[in-house]
UniProtKB/Swiss-Prot annotation:
Membrane association type: Single-pass type I membrane protein
Matching Gene3D superfamilies: Immunoglobulins
Sugar-bearing residue positions: 318
Protein name per UniProt: Ig-like V-type domain-containing protein FAM187A
Lineage: Eukaryota, Metazoa, Chordata, Craniata, Vertebrata
Pfam families reported in the protein's UniProt record: V-set
Subcellular location: Membrane
Domain of life: Eukaryota
Family: Belongs to the FAM187 family.
Keywords on record: Disulfide bond, Glycoprotein, Immunoglobulin domain, Membrane, Signal, Transmembrane, Transmembrane helix
Organism whose genome encodes this protein: Bos taurus
Amino acid sequence: MNLAHTTVLLWAWGSLQAFEIVEKENIFQRTPCPAFLMFDNAAYLTDMSFELPCPCKPEEVSAVVWYYQKHLGSSHTKVLTDFDGRVLTEAAQVRVGSDMLVRFSIRMFSLLVFRAQPEDSGLYFCGTRKGDYFYAYDVDIQSSEGMVATFKDQGQEPLEDEYHGSLRVFTTFWEWTPCDRCGVRGEQWRIGLCYLQSPDLSPRYRKILPNVVSCGSRAVPRQLRAKASDHNPELLVRSCLMPCEKKKKVQEGVMAIFNYVSKVGSRPWLPQVPIQFHQQRLGHGLIISCPGARPEHAVAWDKDHQYLYRTQYLKGVNGSMRVFIDHGNHLHIRFTQLEDRGIYYCWRQGERIAGFRLGVTSPGRYPVSFSDPETRAALGLILIGYMLITVIFISIHLCRCCCYLFRFCPNFSPRLSRPQL
């Protein structure tokens, strides 16, 4: 009996030893800060969200402060946080065109920037409230305005590398996205950003490869950046086919209740995804966004049973497109017509997640508001028209006055011929 008690006590003691608290390794203790401040190069596309970690800091520093400079040595430096590092921003509250100080967040010493814009390009510093810097980034936000779309199914090839002496300009592609639809033919694409290779880059910037940085990096001298300005980002698109994941079947009891409620007739329409209803005035524009989608996600759009493929509906494929998908995965409908009514389904990462039932109403009478962008655009066109008419009217009268003053105007009055007797 004593032997049994001893065995139990030894087992209990061993179990207690197994539950010792293991302290998590502190990354700041094993990551020394560089003795000479270098800049890590990073490139993103417009409207992307990205994170800049602060991998090193002294142990006595409990909170970091992020700083921003447009150019190295600039006298104007933005402080991107309060001096306690407690600024928080929800990504869902960020809109396109929001100020930079609204589109960022500090979490666990890292800087998060939402929906980045080209004007956000520059230098980001992680440091203290006293202005001591630990780590720095060279961020290049490339615009999607002139983005070149390449469709592999049509036999198109990406842009070729450009050579200007020792300067090489090329495109670096990201990984392929997942197929944007399942069960039917879908599409997948990869984003390509502009990079260059040159021996004339600043040595203070850390390169991804030897002498290779993004085209908008601060390491690129101004004369080299001008040569690479015509090389736009690329979008490579190809077809794909992916099976749908099997979803759990509805329980038989739930289906029995559903059949009982719907009685013996036709069952009511039950949407497979959440549907949002929206009414739009005839002739006005509309932009639909897919919930939770980002530019790097695989997003697709359908109208009822029609698939809106990028090979036909991507922005820039046809200059006169009224319905198109931009490079940020938004669906645009310009000058809404009655035939635009229907349900628009949104796919994200190969799964259909939401629908938008669009209704189109006749214009009728509605109060004019100067906050309406279409009202402002119409007033702007009217003012430009009046200004052109005024300029033409004044120019004609000035010309006539000059003619009469200097007496060199031709006489355009018809001459009357005398009748011959």
